[in-house]
Amino acid sequence: MSWIERILAKPKINKRRGVPEGVWSKCTACGNIIYKADLERSLNVCPKCDHHMRVTGRSRLDIFLDKDNREEIGTDLEPKDVLRFKDSKKYKDRIAAAQKSTGENDALIAEKGTVKGVPLVAVAFDFNFMGGSMASVVGAKFVLAAEVCLKHRIPLVCFSASGGARMQEALMSLMQMAKTSAALARMSEEGLPFISILTDPTMGGVSASLAMLGDIHIAEPKALIGFAGPRVIEQTVRQTLPEGFQRAEFLLEHGAIDMITDRRDMRDTVARLLAKMQNLPSTEATEVSVNE
């Protein structure tokens, strides 16, 4: 090889090995690249911008409840395609696909357990299951959870994450709004606390029923909360909505919710509130310091 060929020859570049999948995550708000193990330790909250990423319903209960003495409620309930509904796809096929991808039987998970030693029932919507939509099984499982609360005289905590009622079940889905509201009315008559925790997003029939019937309403930061979406409202009223409209901070400022709590502080906050609401003796829960 001549001297000119040596100069013009392309240098050998060692190809970098591919990064294994599942090692890194990207914040959907600020674009920060986060080591997945660090993200899990921060409960899926971005360590740079504090953006609260969406989590599954089961993960939310695992984060919230104490590890021991947990009992799942309504595991035998299965959705049925009574109407034989079909849009671009058969409803029964949508159910099967959602069950396969999430590992859940429907969009609500309910468990009896404790948080910092305080007994309760906690339910959580899974937005990954058909948008967390409320259907017959969701309503039935929520009512079962309320009945367990009534039987054992313990409070109920609900984590909402839903697009609203499930259109494939039509009127039967809308009936769950009344059904769940009636169950909460029974709890209220018995003086049992219900804390509603609004996460991103809480919309439609869920926001118009059980999600806004709490004794206390807590939201995660910047959660989208409302009935119709902002784009639909703007198209209907033909006006530009205020900045931050339907976000948790906007609702807090206008008195629609009681407080906004970081996910990493949720266990402490709820345990302390429940201890006060039930006049429990001095426990670990009552000693937690919460910024109010």
UniProtKB/Swiss-Prot annotation:
Keywords: ATP-binding, Cytoplasm, Fatty acid biosynthesis, Fatty acid metabolism, Lipid biosynthesis, Lipid metabolism, Metal-binding, Nucleotide-binding, Transferase, Zinc, Zinc-finger. It is an enzyme of class 2 (transferase). One of its GO terms (molecular function) is ATP binding. GO terms for cellular component: acetate CoA-transferase complex. Its main location: cytoplasm. Pathway: Lipid metabolism; malonyl-CoA biosynthesis; malonyl-CoA from acetyl-CoA: step 1/1. Its EC number is 2.1.3.15. InterPro entries: AcCoA_carboxyl_beta, Acetyl_CoA_COase_Trfase_b_su, ClpP/crotonase-like_dom_sf, COA_CT_N, Znf-ACC. Binds 1 zinc ion per subunit. One of its GO terms (biological process) is malonyl-CoA biosynthetic process. It is found in: Cytoplasm. Residues 23-292 form the CoA carboxyltransferase N-terminal domain. A zinc finger (C4-type) spans 27-49. Zn(2+) binds at residues 27, 30, 46, 49. PROSITE patterns: COA_CT_NTER (PS50980). It catalyses: N(6)-carboxybiotinyl-L-lysyl-[protein] + acetyl-CoA = N(6)-biotinyl-L-lysyl-[protein] + malonyl-CoA. Acetyl-CoA carboxylase is a heterohexamer composed of biotin carboxyl carrier protein (AccB), biotin carboxylase (AccC) and two subunits each of ACCase subunit alpha (AccA) and ACCase subunit beta (AccD). Component of the acetyl coenzyme A carboxylase (ACC) complex. Biotin carboxylase (BC) catalyzes the carboxylation of biotin on its carrier protein (BCCP) and then the CO(2) group is transferred by the transcarboxylase to acetyl-CoA to form malonyl-CoA. Belongs to the AccD/PCCB family. This is Acetyl-coenzyme A carboxylase carboxyl transferase subunit beta. It comes from Idiomarina loihiensis (strain ATCC BAA-735 / DSM 15497 / L2-TR). The gene is accD.
